[in-house]
Design a protein with these regions (language model features):
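Glycine-rich, acidic/polar active-site loops that bind/position phosphate-bearing ligands
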Residues: 1-436
Length: 436
């Protein structure tokens, strides 16, 4: 159901809303917001809300700093962990320059442009993300430690699983915010958890993922815990992935239903993702820590596909009807979902447009090194991934030059900081663990 600005204003008046958070992401996926009083919301809808873009990572230079937020009424939700009297609403925003032109660094806008391109090709793309996270204890000052909340394992129950009530609270909050939880369970690592929610349109799924991450962080904090979405917060435990599930539809039909021929549109779509997988990696896996996850605990390392096989980069899960889809297993939760979902879809659409043939499936366990002979591997480090993406004609055609340059510049700084740090673990804690 579409909402108008007037719908939101009526809701604010009827439901004791006092504050409205106008939320957006920097180009690296970190959520930001500015709060306005509910009485100022009509002005925000009509004139936008100006802010200093030079203070947001990857946005603007000081000499050209003004940007404008425009709230999207369709993203309205009430934050259930905030007070019930004087309630707090949140909406995601689009971003423009003061003259009304789209801002090139708005990654949400990039995803919207890819969705429009798919629509022009007669396609609808649905997306669902599976996001894992860790829960850690905090010290007497409330600062995060590296001590996991529990020592449970995959699908364990209490008393080994001590996060059951946290996941329950997360699921109820998600439901209150319009997300539909599907599954929740303890994951493989000590203190590791997963909560899955229903797929949706590409843009809504990216919005939902940001909502999910902020919800997990807030509820963990309320319970005296710290939630980490870092890909590999403990080297002796499983990494956290963010598997991206995609289905494409033409004339109401899911193209992943039934057998997928190498020369079918679904086959071309998968082929496009495989062809551009290495170029996408610095976006799917954007920090140095991301690369310690590859090749273990069901995290892929090679460019390949198969049905069901969890050692593959792309797999086709066993499903029927509307749930037939592909699953890309390389992304991790530190990524910007707008960029990643947009680039995944763009790669698949490129495969369709160029009629790329689908390679033969690889039906081997690629966690055994000998089984991977002859296969192309994903980049082994962030620096290698940046080099590949920076030389990619595909990436250059996809992303606005200012966004791309800022992104690579920031990642190169991350590489230098990590590689030159006297204590890489201490550097990682300050620059990644505490922020992701």
């Amino acid at each position: 159901m579409k909402h108008t600005a007037q719908d939101i204003l009526n809701y604010v008046e009827d439901n004791d809303v006092k504050f409205v958070r106008l939320a957006f992401c920097d180009i690296f996926g970190n959520q930001k917001n500015i709060s306005v009083f509910a009485g100022d919301l009509p002005y925000a809808f009509e004139q936008g809300v100006c802010f200093d873009g030079s203070s947001i990572a990857g946005f603007m230079n000081t000499e050209e700093s003004d940007l404008v937020l425009w709230p999207d009424p369709d993203t309205m939700t009430i934050l259930p962990w905030r007070p019930t009297e004087g309630r707090v609403m949140r909406m995601y925003c689009d971003i423009t320059l003061p003259n009304g032109r789209p801002f090139a660094g708005n990654s949400r806008g990039y995803l919207q442009s890819v969705v429009k391109r798919a629509k022009a090709m007669g396609l609808r793309c649905d997306v669902g993300c599976e996001c894992e996270f860790y829960l850690f204890q905090t010290d007497e000052h409330g600062n995060p430690t590296r001590i996991p909340m529990d020592h449970g394992g995959y699908f364990d129950i209490a008393p080994l699983d001590k996060a059951e009530n946290i996941r329950r609270e997360i699921c109820f909050a998600m439901e209150d915010m319009g997300l539909r939880p599907q599954h929740s369970h303890h994951e493989s690592g000590f203190g590791q958890n997963e909560v899955d929610f229903m797929y949706s349109t590409a843009l809504k799924s990216a919005d939902n993922l940001n909502t999910f991450k902020s919800t997990v962080k807030a509820i963990a904090d309320r319970n005296g815990l710290f939630a980490s979405f870092m890909p590999k917060p403990m080297q002796d435990q499983a990494g956290s992935g963010m598997h991206v599930n995609v289905s494409i539809h033409r004339d109401g039909k899911n193209l992943f239903q039934g057998d997928i021929a190498p020369d079918s549109e679904a086959g071309h779509f998968i082929a496009g993702i495989l062809a551009h997988a290495r170029e996408l990696t610095c976006f799917c896996n954007p920090i140095p820590n991301s690369y310690t996850r590859f090749g273990s605990c069901e995290a892929p390392k090679y460019v390949s596909w198969s049905r069901q096989n969890r050692s593959q980069l792309v797999r086709l899960p066993s499903a029927t009807g509307e749930f037939c889809r592909l699953e890309l297993r390389s992304p991790d939760p530190s990524c910007n979902p707008y960029l990643v979902i947009g680039l995944i879809l763009a790669a698949g659409l490129d495969g369709i447009e160029k009629e790329m043939p689908l390679p033969a499936p690889v039906n081997r366990n690629l966690f055994h090194k000998s089984a991977a002979e002859g296969l192309e591997s994903l980049p082994e480090s962030l620096r290698e991934a940046i080099t590949i993406a920076a030389q990619s004609d595909f990436i250059a055609k996809q992303l606005p030059v200012p966004l791309m340059n800022k992104y690579f510049e920031y990642q190169t700084q991350l590489c230098h900081g990590y590689e030159s740090a006297p204590d890489p673990q201490a550097w990682e804690r300050e620059n990644c663990f505490l922020k992701i």
